[in-house]
Amino acid sequence: MKKHTVTAALAGLLVLSSAVPALAAGVKPATGIQVWVDGKKEAYKIAPIVRNKQVLIPLRQLATSLGIPLDAKHITFNTARQSTTIRYDQATVVLVSGSPEAQINGIKVPLSTSTILTKQGVTYVPVDVVKEAWGKQVIWDPASQTLQIGVSNKDKVVEILKSFETGNTKAAEAWISKDQYIQHNPSFASGRDAFLQGISQSKGANVLVEVQRVIQDGNDVAVHYKKSIAGKTSIGFDIFRFDSNGKIVEHWDNMQDSAPINPSGHTMIDGTTQITDPNQTETNKTLIRKFVDDVLVGKNRAALESYYNGDQYIQHNPLFGDGVSSLKQALSAAGQGASIGYDQVHMVLGEGNFVLVVSELKSPKGTSAAVYDLFRVENGKIAEHWDVVQEIPAKTEWKNTNGKFLKMHI
């Protein structure tokens, strides 16, 4: 099929205008809408419209706001199907006029309303496609007629963590709630000011933050990363909870000193990073929760092999090698009191093939510890695993009273 440029596609739409209806019932011109993208107010020649209380934006203007080039490589139109295909930033999005869903990287995703192709040849797209395809934050305030399209929560978190490299608090001030921030790291006082102070104090400390994985589950964003301070390296997980306005209101984390490669040659942080199977998120979360409850907390070792594909298992724990056989030995040692025992699950987060479980356990010293286990699922079986274990200090040493796990949710 011959590809058309956006300009040519719109010209083709004009030819088809006799076959295309005008704005349908329930569609209202919305000339008073203010659109802000990444903090910049947009001046659209063609105003957005509102349909069934949902905002739709003209495709060309939305593409320009997002930095999507208006060329045939990035946007094409299929006249016969009345569909538009957008290729940008690792996402291929197909929108069909009259359809209340988008196809994103081959997966059907429901939208708040249907794409509209007007009699005048203008394609209006539901603004939530921006969130579904590119992870942008979308906030619509009907009272003020203001639409905000901004930095995704994932990007906010990465930007804040990278702030420790420079000591610049600008990102944290922008994205962390000034009055509602709850801190669960016992080494910091609660509230935003203590977090900002921590960033400021890192200036000139030779800090390097390397983010390896970022997953988002609803309002929660979890990051798996390596942090070096003056040459001393740690591996960590951070979890940030956002409110409906895109502000961070709660934070948990877990850190462990980096260890040498394990018996199979893996580090604590390397391995698979690509998120796949977004439609399997809940299924995979259920699988991993069942595994942890059954095998780790419940100590049902007989069920272990049913969660794996034979002996195919990539292990990033620094003490053990690949294979289910190696895991069996580790769990057997734990059963004899040589290692740790899982007591309680506090949180399960997932996105696609990755599932993060936050649990509480007993350390060899008899004190409590937190463990963050990250699993990668492939074809319904556990395929890869990372973890970070950190002992919880005595309450007398805490700088806040929020607890390591309090208010976590499953």
Specify the residue positions occupied by each region the protein language model found.
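C-terminal and inter-domain tail/linker signature
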Residues: 150-410
